[in-house]
Amino acid sequence: MDLNFKKTTLGYGNRIAIKGFSAKLKAGSLVAITGDNGAGKSTLLKAIAGLIKPLKGKITKPKKSRIAYLAQQCDIDQTFPIDVKTLVKTGLWSFCGLWKNQRPYDSKIQNALEMVGLTELATHSLETLSGGQLQRALFARIIVQDADIILLDEPFNGIDRNTQKDLLALITYWQQQGRTVLTALHDPLVVQEFFPQMIQINQQNAFYGETTQFLDNTIDYIMPPLISNSLCISARKHLSPINDSLFLRL
């Protein structure tokens, strides 16, 4: 169940974010999406989710595949009057509908809450949750969706270290189950440790390959020819190829 991009150009109106991206992501890939703010990371995730259409080219997904998409927390209204369990239940809508009896899925919801450590907060309203607790609840919602492709947009922003550690373990578990996970993020150390593949977006160009091709602990690094572009760049600098920030291996 591969995810394919064929000369895909993405953007809004006359503003192009990604131009002519081609790549083939095998089922079970664990991919970090990196780039500066506004580079097009969110645009790429929205296109995969089907929320926007490519300006040119196409994105091919497996037929009947389920997709779970988690937007950035700033796009989520935490004052909406529902509790944690109800939020998690909304993950069932994609395959059982809004009005169908959801009681047969109670054990699935309970299991999801246990996996993210929120059993005791099931009846708490969203506005009482910390940033980390809200993100745990949103990950529980993804669990009940039972998706083949999981898209996460900056899932670690504004959360504590323990929550980040637990959610990274869950992401790794999803990948081990054969699910394809794409995650937009900035931290090069997290990318290096947990994500075997990555998509780097830079000035409308997107490059896909093994993370080791992008992150090198030497001063010299080479961006080899990748699927999406025949361009070969050789550079000598002390900066991370992810976001031009200082990169140190400790």
Describe the predicted segments one by one.
Residues T34-D36:
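The feature captures the beta-strand-to-loop junction immediately N-terminal to the Walker
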Residues R103-L121:
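Conserved ABC ATPase "signature" region
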Residues S125-L129, Q133:
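Conserved ABC ATPase signature
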Residues I150-E154:
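Catalytic Walker B motif of ABC-type/P-loop ATPase nucleotide-binding domains
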Residues L185-H186:
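H-loop/switch region of ABC-family ATPase nucleotide-binding domains
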Residues P196-T211:
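H-loop (His-switch) and adjacent beta-strand-loop-beta switch element
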Residues T211-L250:
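ABC ATPase nucleotide-binding domains
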